[in-house]
Amino acid sequence: PTMAANSNEKTVAFTALTEDGTGTFTVDVANLNIKKPGMYYYTVTETPRNTAGVDYAAKSMIMVITAGYADDGEDSSLSYWAALHDSTNYNDKNSKFENTYTAGSLKVTKKVTGSLGDKDKKFNVDVTFTAPAGKTVKSTITYVNNGAESIAPDAWKLNTTTNQYEAKVTVELAHKGSVQFNNIPKDVTYIVEEQDYSREEYTATYEGDKSGTIANDVKSTTITNNKGDDNIDTGVILDNAPYILMLAVVA
């Protein structure tokens, strides 16, 4: 890139990646204290942030500032030209700091079994996400449950016991229902826990990954609620046949 021809603002724009796409940063040449003609070399590195799911560029770049007189010295003001080189490939002048964001998904499915299981009943399921230690979540997790829902970055709260950020949501699921959480940053951990329905004589079992760590894939768990197999008062099975009640009347 070349420096803007504005003597009052000596800045050079370079390409850089952010979690939102492509961005730029500026270098104020005036702050480099270049007073004489010549070529000046600077090492430019990126300082990693603490955004969950992001791998930051580890390489450095070489910034070359050339200071000289554009009019063979007749004008006493120095002009500046800038170039940014990849430190591993000096001929590459189009390099950038490239950060990689990786996310995964979590799918929770509900099944209801047993002769007394209510397949229309909605069960409350708590899902708790925990950010990696020292990290914050800046992306929005989306899911659909009774309409489009999301977990925004400001929904994450610091757990003062673990010193990690957490976000917790409750979803409703009936038989054969499911919910999938998308755009969960990698290395975020999760726990799926259905609320207690033992007083209603439901027994919950989990299949798959009830808890785990998000990666670049889809984690899944199925919660099965069973009721009734051991509570049937066995006897004559009526099915849908008429039930005839006989009364003996004693005169």
List where the protein language model places each region:
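Solvent-exposed loop/turn and edge beta-strand elements of beta-rich ligand-binding domains
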Residues: 1-251
